[in-house]
Amino acid sequence: MLRQITDDVRIAMEKDPAARNFIEVLLLYPGVHALISYRMAHGLWNMEFNFLARALSQFSRWITGIEIHPAAKIGNRFFIDHGMGVVIGETSEVGDNVFIYHGVTLGGLATKKAKRHPTIADNVVIGAGAQVLGPIHVGRNTKIGSGSVVLQDVPEYSTVIGVPGRVVYSGISADMEDSDGLESFPDPVARAIECMLDRLPQMEKEIRMLKETLKQNGIDQKEAVVIDQETMKGNQS
């Protein structure tokens, strides 16, 4: 447990450029405090001291604003940045080297006593306010955008955004492989605009050719528009 706590502090120093030294992170980072409490509560839970485990978890929630159920399974080098509002449910499973921001929920959709929370594989980044719900699996090296609501399995090396969450990129990217945060997210709006700009020269060429064809056939452009509108109305009726 001590080694895990040490790793949790060190990963916070690696991930957060504002972290200055080991002591500062250990004493002043609520995400680290919540993890230390969780590690202790999880040990108590495994020894079947369930009430004490829940009591420690509840105390940590009051102090840090972060709720982690003591039965959840969390791997090594886990970092919660800022932390406030994070909720990790009872049957959640989190791999190694996972990085989440404030307001993230790993929640359940069912009320039955079974696996009802998500499984997060290694090297996943989850943006602020994202909701990952249900007994789904999020593959390794995936990045989930801020405010997304993820309800289905996500393949590894994916980028997920939106409500409901959708995969906008899937595959290995050198930028994403080397990135620890969200800065390497592909921008779907920018991509759509790029596609439109790529198509624009071809469309202009086709319009010029169409105008030339109309001119050669002695058809006025305005008349052609009127004819086309009448044709469309006839098809609709």
Question: Where do the language-model regions lie?
Answer:
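Generic signature of intrinsically disordered, low-complexity segments enriched in small/polar residues
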Residues: 41, 82, 102-104, 172, ...
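A structural signal for small-residue-enriched, beta-sheet-centric alpha/beta enzyme cores
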Residues: 166-178
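Structural signal for interior beta-strand "rungs" in well-ordered beta-sheet cores
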Residues: 61-168
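Terminal amphipathic alpha-helical/low-complexity segments used for targeting or macromolecular assembly
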Residues: 1-61, 175-237
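Solvent-exposed, flexible loop/coil residues
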Residues: 31, 36-39, 72, 78, ...
